[in-house]
Amino acid sequence: SLKEKGRWPWPRTYMADLVDKISGAGAAVIGFDILFPEPDSYIPFQAVQEAVKKKDLTNINSESLMQWMHEVGDSDRLFAESILKSEKVVLGYFVYAEGDRSGDIDEKLTAQQMEMLDFSQYPITQRFDKPGDEVPLRVMQSAGLSIPAFVDAANSVGYVSFVAEVDGVVRWVPMVMQLGDYLFPPFSLQMLREATMLPLAVRIAPFGIDDLKLGETVFPTSQSGDYLINYYGPAYTFTHYSASEVLDGKIGKKELENKIILVGGTAAGTYDFKTSPYGPLYPGVEVHANIIENLVQQDFIVRPATWLHLLDFGIILVSGVLLGLISIYFKAYAMAGMLLLGVFGYLGVDLYLFTQKGLWVNTVYPVFSQIFVYSGITVFKFGFEEREKRFIRGAFSQYLAPAVVNQLMDNPN
């Protein structure tokens, strides 16, 4: 696209044409993972050329001429009109949460920004927490929005921010962000709501998120409202189309009809790359695609908090009892075999639950608990046997032949 249409950012006339083409192809919804924070300074020559043919410019001063050129070549107006006419566009915006380590953010949301975001709140909200309850939701501190003309024209807006962990990997997305009494959904959820036209609802309890659903589909989140992303593969797992091919008519109704379309940068230098579990340089727009596909297909990864601790305790208890019984009747190599069987058996079950059932259970704790139990029994048994051998050697070495003493140490019974 950059090779065909020139460097980024493009004139807004291109973006207007892109919306018209995608909307005309019958797309279900169009989401822009792109921020348009400033007015476009580009004046399209073709628009001015057409307008000159219709206006007498013989008696016009320079100031009036510049104002007239801006009016006829107002690419922002053209883009806003395309967004409004489409009735399918969702715009993204960036947020900084409290405690964000990406920079020192002192700015707060202005009254104008709050007014711009007002229509993008959760449509249905039930709160069972009390004033003063410290509900563990992520709090929005400031935001970066597109210019008001675009936000007003869009069907909806949603934040495109993720939750990067200490290793920099994006595994979670906040499904709810709070600002005062207002609750806001993310970009991906807003797109899905627009595509399905189903009601979006959230229920807040004193401990955090109690329920979040679109229509009758309930989405699993943590108490703070974070959703664990189920990645389908490395970068470019989803179908990518060049924007220039859409603008040139090479991609149209056949490819785009009834599809959820995300528009974003994937070229080097656009700076919208994340680190995913599959590695770095993962296009941010494709992270949103994974989230939307998760929600559409209900491919959730669930952490079963209700019985997870019972499973860990059960593994430790059962492995301890079994290894303890084996240590009484069998040699160390039998214990080692039992340990390997237990570890690889658990890893197999763990892998099956994760890949086939979407259940995320602890891997490290149960495996290491078996190793620690085995190590403890082995050390205890070795110490006990050594003490018994010393006793036999001291008690019988003066009265029996060395060969007989060795036989007694090998078989104390």
Tell what function each PLM region has.
Residues 36, 227, 231, 241, ...:
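Aromatic side chains
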Residues 188, 241-244, 361-362:
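Helix N-cap / beta->alpha transition motif
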Residues 127-131, 147, 214-227, 355-362, ...:
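Short low-complexity stretches enriched in small and charged residues
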Residues 294-403:
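Transmembrane alpha-helices and their extracellular/periplasmic helix-loop junctions
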Residues 1-218, 222, 256-334:
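Non-transmembrane functional regions of envelope-associated proteins
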Residues 203-251:
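Substrate-access "cap/lid" subdomains that shape
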